[in-house]
């Protein structure tokens, strides 16, 4: 491709509304342009990268014996009503009515459509298992689209679905898909982690997320330094401390704390170390048989944070978890938040495992501006349950029993689920089994954010000059920069011959034939992240050589023109 016949569309300045590196560089490198909030046009350079990611995903899906198909973006409301998700999904589901007053949605996912297709086309156990996938545009009406294509309203996704007669068969396919995802991210040359995850609104029992590690990641992931264990911080289990609870040595004693409404203020004004105190959070209880919600107290060590997902899965706690209002707290306890504690509470108490091994600790006295010191479990508080309700912290023991946990930020780019029968049961998707009886199929679901991978790769591969693409998804393998070509008699012919020869050798080449200063050309090639640049200049031609520069390492290699094609191909593909 010659730049004179191409839309390079690079920008010198960083757009002011671009918050993260990938958004900034995708705009500056001429990969995307904003059409409206959360909506982007993919320019030629960006589309080349997107297509290369798609091709790798497609190849690995095909190797996993998944069959490609294509389903419509527009989906009828009755399928979503049948599955029960029409009301569950919320405002992110973009809905509309056509001229015939029929209601539709723009699909953020395709569980309903694929289940409807399979129940109509698959009738016998002999046709199972089967895995189907598509690479398709998805639409999600994000409340606050941001970070460019990282959180857009329209995006490209690969979604696959598998159908089985047994959980054992589902698990076997799930493992195949897990391996296929690992193969994809390894081929993309990305630093990633598969992590144990919560199933969320999709449903199901077993789930893994795939995260590309990056400081800008929205998710915190925990992984062991002694094994391959990794989990989303929301899912990672905080083990009970191995040390026993010390014996009580102090008596319960109240003391005034007019200046302390938080753990940090308790430390600042009264010298209480956060790990020697507890905080008490009041949430609404699961409704009783009459639909009435009471209150539940959640008690954690002062330096730990509540894990809402863990807490709301406790049978005593309402889901989704909701913090009690100050008015309800005062009515039930007689004190405001900031002075609450477990002593004397007349409501269910759930104590985190780490808080349960404390002795002689400090907590609110359930009286405004007052705390207790010398609190001890089973003496001052006797009726409580113990559960894991906190986020893990770096240095915690790994749940697998090997090593300690580290925490890094990650960008979720893939998510796989063992759905079970959530959708097939609701939509009556069954087949005749070996006994000739109708049996509901069990399902798996496997998603990859294709357009999100493009942004995530940039977050992990950039420097002060621009993008540093992993070779497999670079828009071009090589850029040719002929210095002052339009002022030279010999450079045009040599550059053109090398361009044609390298294309014939199977390389994706960008030939910068613009009438621009060399500095502008070099800056653009570094900005768009071409892995190798072939520099052709008069001085090197005097020695019958050209210069090959590696974008990632900065290494420069002098190559003889007579053997340039083979040498360059070996370096680029090496």
From Swiss-Prot:
Pfam family membership, one: tRNA-synt_2b
Stretches assigned to coiled coil: none
Subcellular location as annotated: Cytoplasm
EC numbers on record: 6.1.1.15
Disulfide bond sites: none
Predominant localisation class: cytoplasm
Keywords in alphabetical order: Aminoacyl-tRNA synthetase, ATP-binding, Cytoplasm, Ligase, Nucleotide-binding, Protein biosynthesis
Catalytic activity line of the entry: tRNA(Pro) + L-proline + ATP = L-prolyl-tRNA(Pro) + AMP + diphosphate
Function (record text): Catalyzes the attachment of proline to tRNA(Pro) in a two-step reaction: proline is first activated by ATP to form Pro-AMP and then transferred to the acceptor end of tRNA(Pro). As ProRS can inadvertently accommodate and process non-cognate amino acids such as alanine and cysteine, to avoid such errors it has two additional distinct editing activities against alanine. One activity is designated as 'pretransfer' editing and involves the tRNA(Pro)-independent hydrolysis of activated Ala-AMP.
Subunit composition and interactions: Homodimer.
Family affiliation: Belongs to the class-II aminoacyl-tRNA synthetase family. ProS type 1 subfamily.
Protein name: Proline--tRNA ligase
Species of provenance: Pseudoalteromonas translucida (strain TAC 125)
Gene (UniProt): proS
